[in-house]
Design a protein with these regions (language model features):
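Conserved beta-sheet core of the metallophosphoesterase superfamily
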Residues: 54, 90-151, 155
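Active-site-proximal beta-strand elements of phosphoester/diester hydrolases
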Residues: 7-13, 78-85, 125-130
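Core catalytic region of metal-dependent phosphoesterases/phosphodiesterases
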Residues: 7-76
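Binuclear metal-dependent phosphoesterase catalytic core
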Residues: 4-5, 22-23, 74, 103, ...
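Helix-adjacent hinge/juxtasegments
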Residues: 56-59, 65-106
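Active-site environment of divalent metal-dependent phosphoester hydrolases
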Residues: 15-20, 41-46, 60-66, 87-91, ...
Length: 176
């Protein structure tokens, strides 16, 4: 595999439903480069499910084995991952964008609000995959996201938990 293309699976806020994650990770294990969970799994940090999954803690995770934030370096991107509650994401992206700049992140992944969100602020793409269990807000879909990163752009596609495409939730964000 060349490094001019990377695929990231992003999921968040399954709130105790282990089976939905197991199904998802098994489905994508062979086809994506990095699997990322943005917190509120409510599972043990030692769970065998987490093998090959990058993960952070959420406000409902009481196992202190999870990091609060992660910075992942791939051949194409610098990815900052956090749940979002520590950066007041319910009130906008300002606090998180300061942290993103500090981390020199190309891509910021977060959860917490249970709402699908995808926005480029300056050179950085901020993305919330929504909740795979308990969607909130105007888009009532139990969702996750696949990001295909190339040297030119981020290609974002949201999916339902049964692996079907949410067709109007496909976006391309050019890289600077």
């Amino acid at each position: 595999k060349g490094t001019n293309r990377m695929k990231y699976l992003v999921v968040s806020d399954n709130h105790g439903n282990r089976e939905v994650l197991e199904t998802l990770f098994n489905h994508y294990r062979q086809s994506v480069d990095v699997m990322i969970h943005c917190g509120d799994s409510e599972l043990s940090a030692q769970d065998s499910l987490w093998e090959r999954v990058e993960k952070v803690t959420g406000n409902c995770d009481y196992d202190n084995g999870y990091p609060k934030t992660l910075t992942i370096e791939t051949p194409l991107d610098r990815i900052f991952v956090t749940h979002g509650h520590l950066y007041d994401v319910r009130f906008g992206l300002q606090t998180l964008s300061f942290k993103a700049a500090e981390e020199q992140a190309d891509l910021v992944l977060f959860g917490h609000t249970h709402q699908i969100a995808c926005e480029q602020v300056g050179p950085t793409l901020f993305l919330n995959p929504g909740s795979i269990e308990q969607p909130r807000g105007s888009i009532q879909e139990q969702s996750y996201c696949i990001i295909e990163s190339t040297t030119e752009a981020f290609h974002v596609q949201y999916y339902r938990k049964d692996f079907t495409v949410i067709s109007d939730l496909a976006f391309t964000f050019p890289k600077p």
